[in-house]
Amino acid sequence: MKILVTGAKGFVGQNLVANLINIQQGKNRTRPALQIDEIYEYDITSTPQELETYCAQADFVFNLAGVNRPKDQSEFMQGNFGFASTLLDTLKKHGNTCPVMLASSIQATLIGRYGESDYGKSKLAGEELFFAYAKETGAQVLVYRFPNLFGKWCRPNYNSVIATFCNNIANDLPIQVNDASVELELLYIDDLVEEMLDALEGKAHRCNYDGLAAQAAADGRYCYALTTHKVILGEIVELLDLFK
């Protein structure tokens, strides 16, 4: 099997690629059904020709590329919708209808505090693009709406409140909390990677959404990781303070 990972140098991409390499090299034997021949790592420094080659040969695509902290709000749509369009167009060009996974966000629900999120709007546009692609080509698409992620190799002050809080407390920096009563849904990176490996084996967990909550459904439109943790923001700060 040849696997394309876009956004391979990002937080999720690094963790996924490391696990794929361990499986490929026989260091991780928990997935004996997976036979990995090639891992194509595509990121911002990769060339258009590399994308052409990878899209022509891939048996499965993890699309993790995206923009979280743009200099301008318009970059959300360009980075999250624009590249997704380029990726799918390139797959179509080569007649490759392999399964494609999309890393979306819970912000794509545009519910509550996410209602005016430009990031969420760009992710929702990417989702609709993928669903239209599936209808047009018959390819399987697996759309995951990630909640708040945390774990190793996560950058502070970027896309994880946990990484930011840990960094600030470790370095005696102040923590800013606007509303300590906010409930967060957290997903640990290793739990996410296990779900992504399930998807690679054809065992993705399907769901539909009732507001912000994933509801298991065998024929669900979306996919999700089973193990998440719901916590109050203020309680996270109190817990981390205990490590000082």
Tell me the role of every PLM-derived stretch.
Residues 1-26:
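N-terminal Rossmann NAD(P)H-binding glycine-rich loop of SDR-like oxidoreductase domains
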Residues 6, 61-65, 100-106, 144-146:
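SDR active-site strand-loop-helix element
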Residues 45-82, 86, 90-94, 107-114:
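NAD(P)H-binding glycine-rich loop region in Rossmannoid oxidoreductase-like domains
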Residues 85-127, 132-137, 141-142:
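Conserved Rossmann-fold NAD(P)-dependent oxidoreductase catalytic core, especially the SDR/UDP-sugar
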Residues 116, 147-157, 179-187, 222-229:
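Glycine-rich "substrate-gating" loop/helix at the edge of Rossmann-like oxidoreductase active sites
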Residues 128-153, 167, 173-182, 219:
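Conserved beta-loop-beta element that borders a ligand/cofactor-binding pocket
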Residues 156-164, 181-202, 234, 238:
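Substrate-positioning beta->alpha
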